[in-house]
Amino acid sequence: MRSQLSAPIDTTNFYLSLLHETDFDDLYAVASDPLLWEQHPERDRWRKDVFVLFFQSALVNDLGCFVIREKSSDRVVGSTRFYGLDELGGLVRIGFTFIERSLWGTSANAEIKNAMLTRCFGPFKAVLFDIAPSNRRSIGAVNKLGAIYSETLSPTKAVYRLPKSHWIRQS
C-alpha cells in the first residue's frame, strides 16, 4: 500500500515525483512567496529558516512527499503529499499542498488532486484533508471535489472528509 501511494504520478500537465534533498532550492523558490501562506496557520513558512523545517519533515514523511513539476517547462511549481495512513479504517490524508500563485484559479490543483484521488479510491473508502478554518482558499478547493466538513480538532485544524461516493471529478 505504501509503495503504491509513493509511486510517481503523471497527469496531463504535471509530473509528481518523490521529493529529494536536491529539490530544496527549486521548491523554496516557490515557497518563498509570502502570499502563498497568508491564510495558513504558519504564515511565515516563506522564511527560509521556517521552510527548512517543513522541508525536512517532508523528506521523512512515511508515505513520501511529492514535488510537482510542470511538464511543459520541467519547472518545480509546488508540493503535496499523502500522510496519516489508516489501513484498517480505509483512510488516508492528502495535504501540505502548495502551488505557485500563477497556477491559482486554473485547473492545476483539481488536476493534481484528481490524480491523487484516483490512486486513493481503489484501496481507500475516504480521504481526509486537514485545513485551517481560516484557509478559505483550501476549503473552497476541497469543497469543489465533494469533501464535507467533518470536525474541528484545534483552532488551526479542521477535518474535511471525502468519501468515494461524494467525489466530484474536476476537469
Predicted regions and their residues:
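Glycine-rich acyl-CoA binding loop
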Residues: 108-109
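GNAT-family acyltransferases
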Residues: 1-105, 114, 118-122, 126, ...
